[in-house]
A protein has these predicted regions:
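Glycan-recognition and catalytic cores of secretory/periplasmic carbohydrate-active enzymes
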Residues: 1-178
Length: 178
C-alpha cells in the first residue's frame, strides 16, 4: 500500500470481500470457518482443525477487517469484525483466570452450555497478542463498545502477568491453568 499502486488495495478489497462472504458460519458455530474445499463448502475434516476453532485466527481476522474498513469502509467488514469480537469473550476466553484459549470445539454437544477445549487449557502467546490487537484496534477505530477496551486491557494484564519472565528476562510461549 505504501507504493500507492491501486492494484494492491483492489487485491486486498477482493480478499476481504471473499473472507466476509465465506468465513462467517453463524448458523453452525459462533466461530468463523477456516477450511474449505475448492467449491467453498466447509472442510470439517482437515488435519487438526476438523470442526474446531483457532481462537487467535478469529481475533486476527477481526482486527484485520477493522484495518481494511479504515482503508475502504464497508459495512460488511465492520459487521463481521464485531460478530467475531462479540463471540470470543463468551466462547474462547477464560473468564475465570483471563486470557484467550488456543483451540475450541466449534459446536456444543447435547446438554452442553460451553464450548469445549480441544486438548487442554493452553494459552499461547500469539493468541494473546491477537486478542490484545483486536480489542485495542476495534476500540480505537469504532469507539462504539466500551467492553472492547476492557477486553484489551484485561488481555494485556494477563499477558504481562503470565507470559513475561521477570526473573530471567525472557518470555513463556505457552501457559496452562495449573
Amino acid at each position: 500500500l505504501a507504493t500507492e499502486d491501486e492494484s494492491y488495495s483492489t487485491f486486498l478489497e477482493d480478499t476481504f470481500d471473499t473472507i466476509c462472504e465465506h468465513f462467517p458460519d453463524y448458523g453452525y458455530s459462533p466461530f468463523m470457518n477456516e477450511k474449505f474445499y475448492k467449491d467453498w463448502s466447509h472442510d470439517l475434516n482437515w488435519g487438526i482443525h476438523q470442526a474446531r476453532c483457532v481462537v487467535g485466527h478469529n481475533l486476527k481476522v477481526a482486527w484485520n477487517l477493522t484495518r481494511m474498513h479504515s482503508l475502504k469502509p464497508k459495512e460488511s467488514y465492520k459487521v463481521f469484525a464485531h460478530q467475531i469480537a462479540d463471540a470470543i469473550p463468551g466462547s474462547g476466553c477464560d473468564n475465570q483466570r483471563g486470557g484467550w484459549y488456543d483451540m475450541m470445539e466449534r459446536t456444543l454437544k447435547d446438554g452442553e452450555e460451553n464450548h469445549r477445549l480441544v486438548w487442554h487449557d493452553r494459552k499461547a502467546w500469539w493468541q494473546q497478542e491477537q486478542g490484545i490487537l483486536a480489542y485495542y484496534i476495534m476500540a480505537g477505530v469504532y469507539d462504539d463498545k466500551p467492553e472492547y477496551l476492557k477486553f484489551a486491557r484485561e488481555g494485556t494484564a494477563f499477558y504481562n502477568g503470565w507470559f513475561l519472565d521477570y526473573e530471567e528476562g525472557g518470555i513463556y510461549f505457552n501457559v496452562l491453568a495449573n
